[in-house]
């Protein structure tokens, strides 16, 4: 383990990101989000009024000083590719800055699509090697968080690790969804189990387990060697969590990086924020939290901006209708191009170009871009997919049986509405 002075830290914080390439795994479908991911990959799902989920990993890279990135895509990638081409094309190739799109092209075998997260990198090794990076940062493109990867890179170098895994405590009842680890006093990982049925607890807190966040830093040459070995292993599922990390742990070369050390937050006393918005309820809840008075995730931090594609739109407009009813909002996010006419919107998130017509009541709802809400509608505890046309007088979120019959209703009572569902009910979706 190497001990560094403050000046050395500052120098490494500048140098290490320049020696690194980030690979963002963005090919997942996100089946737990149900019909919301029927036509788009989970990283391309809208979030927070104007962003896509992948914008958080990409913005973290830029803000951390990493300006060489590869985005590995597979499932329903068109929307994601289009978003990156439109919103992330500002890099200077002459300065060796880029975002490479790496779709599944069956390069290595001629038969297989990506068989697992590790195989997604293996199939692109010929391209990745050309980057000539010293360190490779592996990221999931479907999580919401703010992290300074330069701090994790410093931790990796200080500990003399070949592989570093970002981790954080999670409630033990939720830990079966993650890789779970045990560490020694120097943060060396001494045990790693992927998605255990009975997750082990932390020694100092029996109510929690130490979970992998799916964020890794590797020495580049070591990673390439591991991937080639794994590709030859016919018994491997070719996955980082299931195969590579346990193998590295057994060799004594994996270290843990506590997420609070690199989490970026405006309030140092706040709990570190990281969300896998993989279920409809988690997605709905994380969006609505941004509309609260003091949200858990600070989106207004000028020192750590979240970038995205910014369409040229007019400002949001709140107008009274012909009867004199005023368009009003409270504790809500309303994006550009929206028009609220003689209706009330409370504790909701409205993405761009949403139109809410007269006499409506919108409460605790997430409306994706270009949704049209007809007159006299009541929408509660719901997510309305892009470009849905909600017919006049429709009520959603007040009758559990009716919601479940017409749409998708989660166990927690969150209703998902899509254009296809509305068409099946006989409602035209063209305006």
UniProtKB/Swiss-Prot annotation:
Q: In which pathway does it act?
A: Glycan biosynthesis; glycogen biosynthesis
Name the Enzyme Commission number(s) assigned to this protein.
Answer: 2.7.7.27
Pfam assignment, any one:
NTP_transferase
Q: What class of enzyme is it?
A: transferase
Q: Which InterPro entries match?
A: ADP-Glc_PPase (IPR011831), ADP_Glu_pyroP_CS (IPR005836), GlgC_bac (IPR023049), GlmU/GlgC-like_hexapep (IPR056818), NTP_transferase_dom (IPR005835), Nucleotide-diphossugar_trans (IPR029044), Trimer_LpxA-like_sf (IPR011004)
Q: How is this protein activated or inhibited? A: Allosterically activated by fructose-1,6-bisphosphate (F16BP) and inhibited by AMP.
Q: Does the keyword Nucleotide-binding apply?
A: yes
Q: Where does beta-D-fructose 1,6-bisphosphate bind?
A: 39, 419-423, 429-431
Keyword line: Allosteric enzyme, ATP-binding, Carbohydrate metabolism, Glycogen biosynthesis, Glycogen metabolism, Nucleotide-binding, Nucleotidyltransferase, Transferase
What job does the chain carry out?
A: Involved in the biosynthesis of ADP-glucose, a building block required for the elongation reactions to produce glycogen. Catalyzes the reaction between ATP and alpha-D-glucose 1-phosphate (G1P) to produce pyrophosphate and ADP-Glc.
Give the NCBIfam families listed for this entry: glgC, PRK00725.1, PRK00844.1
Q: State whether it acts alone or in a complex, and with which partners, per the record.
A: Homotetramer.
The protein in question is named Glucose-1-phosphate adenylyltransferase
Organism the protein comes from? Escherichia coli O7:K1 (strain IAI39 / ExPEC)
Q: What is the lineage of its organism?
A: Bacteria, Pseudomonadati, Pseudomonadota, Gammaproteobacteria, Enterobacterales
């Amino acid at each position: 383990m190497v001990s560094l002075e403050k000046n050395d830290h500052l120098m490494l914080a500048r140098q290490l990101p320049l020696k690194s390439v980030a690979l963002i795994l963005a090919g997942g479908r996100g089946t737990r989000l149900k019909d919301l991911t029927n036509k788009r990959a989970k990283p391309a799902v809208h979030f927070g009024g104007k962003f896509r989920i992948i914008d958080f990993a990409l913005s973290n890279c830029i803000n951390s000083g990493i300006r060489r990135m590869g985005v590995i895509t597979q499932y329903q990638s068109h929307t994601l590719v289009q978003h990156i081409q439109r919103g992330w094309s500002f890099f200077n190739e002459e300065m060796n800055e880029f975002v490479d799109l790496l779709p599944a092209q069956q390069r290595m075998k001629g038969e297989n699509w990506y068989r697992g997260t590790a195989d997604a990198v293996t199939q692109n090794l010929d391209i990745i090697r050309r980057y000539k990076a010293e360190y490779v940062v592996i990221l999931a493109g479907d999580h919401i968080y703010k992290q300074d990867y330069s701090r994790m890179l410093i931790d990796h170098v200080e500990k003399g690790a070949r592989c570093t895994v970002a981790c954080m405590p999670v409630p033990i009842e939720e830990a079966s969804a993650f890789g779970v680890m045990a560490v020694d006093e120097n943060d060396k990982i001494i045990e790693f189990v992927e998605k255990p049925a009975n997750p082990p607890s932390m020694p100092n807190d029996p109510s929690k387990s130490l979970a992998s966040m799916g964020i890794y830093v590797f020495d580049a040459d070591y990673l390439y060697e591991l991937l080639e070995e794994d590709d030859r292993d016919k018994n491997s599922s070719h996955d980082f969590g299931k195969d590579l990390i346990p193998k590295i742990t057994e060799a004594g070369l994996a270290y843990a990086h506590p997420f609070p050390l690199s989490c970026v937050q405006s309030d140092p006393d706040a709990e570190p924020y990281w969300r896998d918005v993989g279920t409809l309820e988690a997605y709905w809840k994380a969006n609505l939290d941004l509309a609260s008075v003091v949200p858990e995730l600070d989106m207004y931090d000028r020192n750590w901006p979240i970038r995205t594609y910014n369409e040229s739109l007019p400002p949001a407009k709140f107008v009274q209708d012909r009867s004199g009813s005023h368009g009003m909002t409270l504790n809500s996010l309303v994006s550009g191009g929206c028009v609220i006419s003689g209706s009330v919107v409370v504790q909701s998130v409205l993405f761009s170009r949403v139109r809410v017509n007269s006499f409506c009541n919108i409460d605790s709802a997430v409306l994706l871009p270009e949704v049209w809400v007809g007159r006299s509608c009541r929408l509660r505890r719901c997510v309305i997919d892009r470009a849905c046309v909600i017919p006049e007088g429709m009520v959603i979120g007040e009758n559990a049986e009716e919601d479940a019959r017409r749409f998708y209703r989660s166990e927690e009572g969150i209703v998902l509405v899509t254009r296809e569902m509305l068409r099946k009910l006989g409602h035209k979706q063209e305006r």
